[in-house]
């Protein structure tokens, strides 16, 4: 949580260092098989025949020779989730060298059903008629099948002296999400609407790193070179919509735009190199140290999107009579209805939805560790040069590439001081500057239609980096081994924070995008406790608690039609606590966990003129909030002998509904006012009951 010059500066809340095992103490191999039951996701499950082919692999006749024309929805019974895992650790003696291997693989297949999910869009409250202004009022049934394959393979080679260590680390993950959504609702024009989305997404990520650590007299040197690859493919996302716009109560196709297919593909490559050196100094009894290093990263990204709509000649076609009123999956699955003179496909050429980019980051830093008796100071500065080039098209109808650079050159100072009163008590104070740079997708003009939001999502080419000043004052008390009580006060100032916003376009449609606010300030208190409870007679019990209170405010220039409010995504409080039981004699572990966060803005609304009710009050699309909910988890593990272990867990025991709300502030011409709760989304996630059985060789 404390900035330091040796760490990358592009973060806001904290930086996570992940260390994996190197050379194991002994050889081991274990296998895990497990299951999970979500009580909202058992029984009937709707799915479809997915497409995995790229457009490039299809022939010239897409409708009859390339597209998957099976639109029929299949139903099957779901009995739960499956999880499999394997972990291995081995060590060898190669002459005087030691070699270690850590390997792991896992597989999971899970089903999640969200039925009767309320999913609404609201505009500015209708003061004249005193009711909420629905841009869409709908109920969704959504069926998700998520699969994951993961693997890790790490090698470590240690020199005979132990002063030189080399590691090769590899992590691979492949995730897929197959989702079918059925939606029934009413549009802003008061038309009945039925729509569906057939969604299949695959994501692949690989991260490889070769590192070295070397200890010399007075110096500790470490280095790394790495390569990472990530992709996100959506092959053939299909959507259709029918409504009663033509004839009241009669659901039918209105236009060809109501049936669409879309292919998107995102590929990213990252190359990196890093070197650090720590030099121990000695001036009589004073032993300061210096640490300095450099980091370089080059990233490339390419995003491609193609969209097709179904079209027909309204006056001259050979389609069945009344085809507009037919069941759409039946209509589209019959190839007799496809082709020239029938239902044909037309590509929506939108070159502006494609982009590519390059990002070059170069950094160097210097820190000094200065001990002064009970006071120790770690001070440093980091320089980062970042150049992000976005290559996008300026016109939809043809390739028209234009390049734009987003460059930052920044110094990031950091200062950490620790005063140690004794072995149990110490006081910490820190300051550091960090940055939050926009991502490619946030500055691209590419438009993507999000079916869940029933809205388009678009980047903002004028987005700029946010710089954060962090101040932290922390008192720490260590009563005994493994115990800690700390109290902290912190302050963060954000210059131009990046936020997720939405606004009305075309009268009834919402567009989500990103924007910079002028500034924001967060000030808070944090309490962290880890305590053994044997002092009150509860042997083998321990308690942990982490809680924070945060006051957050975004500020805008004078005269702006925006309200001072909390920063998007920031909760006013959070609570994480757990009660743990650990009995080594019985080989039993039990944990009860509780989590709650305060309501937080997930989408920033905006002003839209005046209310039009005889008042000069500003009309606003309200901010959208994720509401608090109580989450209890219970887990237990029991070892049997030297080989078997049984793990059981209950997650989200209360299974409280998830709510997203807006709060419309309504003011009337006579001066009276009220607040109206508007439910943007509501669904029940279900509780999870899981077990796993581990066998160790």
Where are these regions (language model features)?
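Surface-exposed extracellular loop regions of Gram-negative outer-membrane beta-barrel proteins
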Residues: 231-233, 324-343, 387, 423-470, ...
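Signature of Gram-negative outer-membrane beta-barrel scaffolds
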Residues: 138, 175, 260, 264, ...
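C-terminal beta-signal and adjacent terminal beta-strands/loops
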Residues: 596-612, 637-697
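Transmembrane beta-barrel wall of Gram-negative outer-membrane proteins
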Residues: 69-181, 204-210, 413-415
